[in-house]
Amino acid sequence: MEQLLHYTWKHRLLPLTELTTTDGRRVEIIDPGLHNRNAGPDFFNAKVKIDGTLWVGNVEIHDRASDWYQHGHDRDPRYDNVVLHVCEVVDREVQNTAGHYLPQMQLSVPQHIRDNYDELQKTDQYPPCYRIIPDLTRLTVHSWMAALQTERLERKTDDIRRRAERCGGSWEDAYFVTLARNYGFGINSDTFEQWALNIPLKAVDHHRDDLFQIEAIFMGQAGLLELDTVPKHYQQDALNDGYFAKLRNEYQYLAHKFSMQPMDAARWNFLRLRPQNFPHIRLSQLANLYYQRKAGLSQLVECTTIDQLKTLLSSHVTPYWETHYTFGSLSAKNEKHLSYGSLNLLMINTAIPMLFAVGRHRQKEELCDRAFDLLEQLKPENNHIIRMWQQCGLPVMSAGDSQALIQLKKEYCDKRDCLRCRIGYEYLRASR
């Protein structure tokens, strides 16, 4: 398997016997080079000594030497700087575009690495590397968690950057879309993002001082001001209480004024949702947040502490929703503030990644550093992923740790990408 051969070369998991080319010249690996995952040679800028002469260039790796021709490398000038061709089976000589024969070296994947890799790929246990985790050094765990935490923030930065592009380059709008997405808290996240992209924020800004009009636009664009979206047994009550009709009339006026089109309300998911998470409640909280001018990027960037972030993101519903979860359904009075857990998730998934992304965009490292510091101050998430890692023996002390472990599961374990994982590395090289 070529991937394992790459791995053996990259990590110098080499036999103890002397390495030689197929024509008997001694090979010494000074630097295996930089692993290239894109088009071109497999390793850039490697340093190898062949019969005492130092060669600096690229290394290409194949299962069989004849793959050189099958892949067309003999006609590709990008491979002219290859100084060593490494193969498990050397079944022929190879030449570059200039007709020069390349030095070749036979290399086999050590049997224990092959066996360990098969275990990782075939076991039904999850995570497959669970047996080795208690034996990992603190340094290994700490350095890997730090790298994963950065990866997680970088991935979220890419998402935010794409939203900014969809918003015509507006990072202010991208923040609103990101905030709205995370108000979906998983089940309705995609729908909230679609909804936010359908909100003409420049138009809404003209009515920013009127909470009722903001809520009318937010509810209307969500498609929730059509009578057939109200459960049948509540429709008459919704018409009688007056608020539904007032919002609908206001929205119809504003929709005509700003040429707005509502989204399809069928996109909203109500199944298995607690009433506290119903779209009506979250939209009212968002309207209040927007009305209080707490949904802006400039306010976020000014936050330097967890308490300031909590104050910024805290919101509650408008008076009607204190006694309702949907139109027409009367309930006990409750101001419906965002819970502590919801605030925590908004800080972890919205505010802190946005600080990091803005830091990258503006080349302000202090904002990136602040994002890391804030993550370390927050309590970790409590979900099935985190509990799984805790049972395996990994420490979870902060939101930084929990984000790192979510990244580990989603980007490595779920994809069985053990060859890029540092825990996988420890598992593969262990002799058992």
Where are the regions a protein language model picked out?
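Short linear interaction motifs
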Residues: 63-65, 402-403
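Compact, glycine/acidic-enriched structural inserts
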Residues: 80-82, 86-144
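N-terminal accessory interaction module
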Residues: 44, 54-55, 60, 66-94, ...
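Hydrophobic, aromatic-lined core segments that form the binding pocket/scaffold
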Residues: 148-404, 417
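Cysteine-cluster motifs in flexible loop/terminal segments that predominantly coordinate metals
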Residues: 403-432
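Low-complexity, highly charged intrinsically disordered N-terminal segments
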Residues: 1-4
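Short loop/turn segments at secondary-structure transitions that flank enzyme active sites
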Residues: 65-67, 90-92, 111-113, 185, ...
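N-terminal ordered "arm"
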Residues: 7-64, 79
